[in-house]
């Protein structure tokens, strides 16, 4: 199975917070999952913790390398830039990642949120999402119990799978 590709400064273990969530399900493919993630306007239709996505510079509706976009999640307005966008093809995992940021100074939060969608044998698909965070808000999130990032991302995965099954 494949791994997330981490940019310098966001390698897990060297940041203020990190979360990892994964599901492996039967009966879906990376190609069925991809449009639900790569089209930000789709996310609020199945995941309650995503709101008000929009693109800048007349881009969109799908993410591409370098495109700037905005959305709201976990109570944060998040400015974002897509830094990795590899659509699913046979024999290679789909990859999607963005750098997101919110706040300034002591309230600044920087994240690298990455997704890996990988077809497996026996009609299974693996969906891995990992997020590495820096800044005081990340430190607070790391110490919050129950962990809102782990729980929120698990909900996103579960809702993503349900939406893909419904779309079949």
Regions found by a protein language model. Give the residues of each.
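Hydrophobic ligand-binding cavity/cleft-lining segments
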Residues: 1-60
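Short Pro/Gly-enriched beta-strand edge/turn motifs at strand-loop
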Residues: 4-6, 62-65, 94-102
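Short beta-edge strand/loop motif at the mouth of beta-sheet-based domains
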Residues: 21, 41-91
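Hydrophobic pocket/interface hotspot
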Residues: 32-37, 43, 69, 82, ...
